[in-house]
Curated annotation (Swiss-Prot):
Signal peptide: none
Gene behind the chain: atg9
Region described as Disordered: 1-197, 748-919
Protein name in UniProt: Autophagy-related protein 9
Species in which this protein is naturally found: Aspergillus clavatus (strain ATCC 1007 / CBS 513.65 / DSM 816 / NCTC 3887 / NRRL 1 / QM 1276 / 107)
Post-translational note: Phosphorylated by atg1. Atg1 phosphorylation is required for preautophagosome elongation.
Sequence ranges of Basic and acidic residues compositional bias: 35-57, 75-85, 129-139
Keywords assigned by UniProt, alphabetized: Autophagy, Cytoplasmic vesicle, Endoplasmic reticulum, Golgi apparatus, Lipid transport, Membrane, Phosphoprotein, Transmembrane, Transmembrane helix, Transport
Amino acid sequence: MMTSNILSRFLPPNNSPSVYEAIRQNDADSDSSDVEERAGLTLEDGHGGHYTDHELQDAMVDADQSELPSPDDAFLARESHHRVPSEGPSKSTSRRRKNSRPRWMQAASPGQDFEYGDDDDVPASLLVEGHHDDEDLKSRLPPPPRPLSPHEIQPSLPGPSSQGDQARWRAARDQQPLHNASRRRPPGVKWSLGQPNLNTVDPKEKAMWMWANVDNLDNFLKEVYSYFLGNGIWSILLTRVLSLLTFAFVVGFSTFLTNCVNYHKVRGSKTLDDILVDRCTTKMSLSSTFLLWLLTFFWIGKAFQCLLGIRRLKHMHDFYHYLLGVSDTDIQTISWQEVVSRLMTLRDANPATAGAVSARHRKFMGSQSKQRMDAHDIANRLMRKENYLIALVNKDILDLTLPIPFLRNRPLFSQTLEWNLNLCIMDYVFNEQGQVRTLFLKDTHRKALSEGLRRRFIFAGFMNIFVAPFIVVYFMMHYFFRYFNEYKKNPSQIGSRQYTPLAEWKFREFNELWHLFERRINMSYPFASRYVDQFPKDKTVQVAGFVAFVSGALASVLALASVVDPELFLGFEITHDRTVLFYLGVFGSVWAVARGMVPEETNVFDPEYALLEVINYTHYFPSQWKGRLHSDEVRREFAELYQMKIVIFLEEILSMIFTPFILWFSLPRCSDRLIDFFREFTVHVDGMGYLCSFAVFDFKKGTNVITQGDRREPARQDLRADYFATKDGKMLASYYGFLDNYGANPRGAHPSTKRQFHPPPAFPTLGSPSAMDLGHLGDRADPPQARPFAGQQSTFGPSRFGPTGLADHGSPAPSMLLDPHHQPSASGFRTAHRTAFSRYRSSRAAPPISGAILDDDESPSAPNRNGSARSAAGAPAPPGGSSGGGVGASDSNLEDSWRMNLTGDTDDEDAGAGGENADAIAGGAGVLGLIQQFQRVNQDGRGRTAVGL
């Protein structure tokens, strides 16, 4: 026996369950096993049989199956109440049966006198909905009917009182009744919290019912956002129909070209009927027939899916139109910030959730609370999975290198690989409700989960082998039909560039929705193209110029000859079967491509300034780029992220071949790190569920707690802090990028405060590093808007509503789109903003700027802020300190930006710091106080030395 016990400790069990069985069992028991999930979120099912107000909803469901009690029921209830003690304790132990009726029904029934102690009620703070939800539910229900009193049942009639007389009275009444015996008690009113007959309900009430019965906010908000991106119901339907038609055309036209045309007869034929194959579909090969039927069934399935989605689109249309007040014409121009504002208004007007929910469903509502629905919460719900993928790319957890000897150091990330990552990782980690499986948050199943993830990678690799040929053919035909005519008309477009899929995930920030990210990246394209063209490519330029000269000369001679005698010369064959028209097209295309490779002669060479403009929009500034923006190594690294479109397409096609090898060899090596990542970078937020820790911004503490490993000295770096921090200041950029999009009030900012987008000029402006030698002209700013020059624009991209925190001057809360617990602190906002701004400055030495603003941790012996704020130009100094060259006035003193008079507040603070209080000296009023205030205004506002009184 001892030997068997010892062996059982070391040998694995024979019938051990698989990791998927453990995941399913853990999902079923997650409410009882996850302590963090139950803490403050779930209800206590067994609290001594005491009654809670939440059972009002259960009673409403029970009332749906029965009628209201009659007066006889009240009498029977009184009789049964006296018989309860004799029936034993077994029938009194069921809490649900005992309290299946709501309190107002219990109080209305005479004889039911249940004793409730003061200590038996559960506080509202411990409940999910709270008592206000029950009150709101009862206010929406019709009032209960008043029970009949005993004297209202039958009016008492005069008659004899003896027993014999009573017997004769009953016999006479039976022969000739005083009341109509056929009269029945009217049926009681039934309450039903289930789905009403929505076909006959007013559309606004239907939309309100749909909103009140939302049980999964993640899916609902995704539909809201998809409807916003699709620009309304008709645009979405048109997009889906055109997508189906495009797919059918590509498949049908490709089948026609490959199976229905006899290309051997093309040369000697004059009409199309001569080269067509009769009944070509019957002569197709077996593989072509199978593929055609497979694509046909796929198209039919997509068509049915489109038809079934019309109902959801109609519901979303009613939600936007009746509850949010956004019509289909306005949705194409309204901003997402305004939609969020109206969602918050709807939340405040209708805080209650679904009416009748089960106990298990009520526990699930712990992660679906409608009270957690401001801009930050909505972004976290919409990007619950995307935030994890952004963090995986940022921290280099994914091994995307090609397992090929000569391409081992080259990462490959395509749209196909992204689909596989979502299938293998995200669908494995998240459950059907969109929450992280609690089994991944424990280290007890780390090995089993890692092995399961490794098997998913290998299985997906084999699936890609069977699917890749069909996808390759479809994408090649679709790309050819779409872009060939464009390249034919404008051959220079072949050299056009765009960001790679990997670059987009590197540039995207936490909680940044797709349309905001796309807008920011699209504004960087002119600057990125200008930066790539900045670098000297003298050899390439010389060769391209020579090719352009030769091809242009030949094309011009042929064009001139065809103009002189077009009828004779256009049919002239220069080579065998090659006429003048053919060579005109060839030479013209070669000339256009070569001419596109030659830069403009008037361009000014300044790659550092051009790259700074790109960084201002992409927010991507690796630590190895510092001090090397002018180098060719940085250009090569950026060129890998900003490639030609034709190269990206070829990589997309080749990735369908190389993706199985990445899934077989590269990604399984990082399966352990992936499991550890989800366990160590997942936090639980009340009412939201499990989120990526980097996506939960600490607005109260600001960014002072955010670790920036690249800013510390190498000798003092903490490895643990670096492990739990993002690379290249990603979280810091995400924090202020989020504030830039949502930090200002949508309706509070004046249109003049919006930052305007300007395309790159042909020469560096005065704000560029190369213009700093001209003096302090780069320090000048626009006083009305306090807007910096183009060379030092806002660090975190274009602001839709102007500078953060400057829109609402009447309140310290910078945004109406954030709840009070998400309002950023003023001190953290100011300090971290200066620190973040310095990351994107030029590495060139700049002339010293008088009156630099000092951070909180600088030496107290430095000049004070009052003196530094009064620079020669009269504008606030740049937030980067004295090391920032050529930076115009920006948002300094951001902690006071909501106030109306910044100068007066600063002076009051300085006077209080000096030990003198003007109000105390002047007595709070009088001539002396006014004179002192006027003296300070003359000294500070006009820069003069006031004459003492």
